[in-house]
Amino acid sequence: ELEHLACPEFINHADCVNCLNANRDVIAGVKVLLSAALADDGRNEAKAFREALQAAVTTATPLMTHHAQSTISIDECPGSMRAGDIYTHCYHGFESTIIDPQSRRVHPAVRAARTRGVLFDIGHGMGAFNWTVGEICAEEGFWPDIISTDLHTGCFEGPAYDMPTVMTRMLHLG
């Protein structure tokens, strides 16, 4: 299996912009998957994030980031994101979680991003929902703007199952 961002030559701003502009009827924005394991041990993550953000700016579309087990700091992502951009899998419990490891509170850069208008999405999926993160966020009133399943073949038999299951988890949090 090829890592998503293993080869830097696959990260191409111009091709992304051209593809998006040619398919505006079906493409709503740009998504970048930031995970060290899928980016040559993180070596290509910074370039991928920069190029994706620039492509979104160039095309005046939102950027969606998957930022889990990433070498990109929480200060940079969602710190560099714009109003209307989407930070998905916001309740994951992996490295680069939105919870500051020292204070065990929502990271100040995350709060600043929300104030700027960055949207936060559950994106439950296979392993992107962590009860401890959810409980901390609930205690602090940091609720997602979007509740989505991120349903795919790896999680329709659990843990996400379907939208009612994801919604029930959110209701359980408060």
Predicted regions and their residues:
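Active-site mouth loops of central-metabolism enzymes
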Residues: L2-A14
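Acidic/histidine-rich helix-loop elements
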Residues: E3-L5, S96-T97, G158
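Generic anion/oxyanion-binding catalytic loop in active/binding sites
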Residues: L5, E76, R169
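Histidine/acidic residue-rich metal-binding segments in metalloenzymes
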Residues: I11-F120, A128-D145
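His/Asp/Glu-enriched, well-ordered alpha-helical/loop segment
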Residues: N130-G174
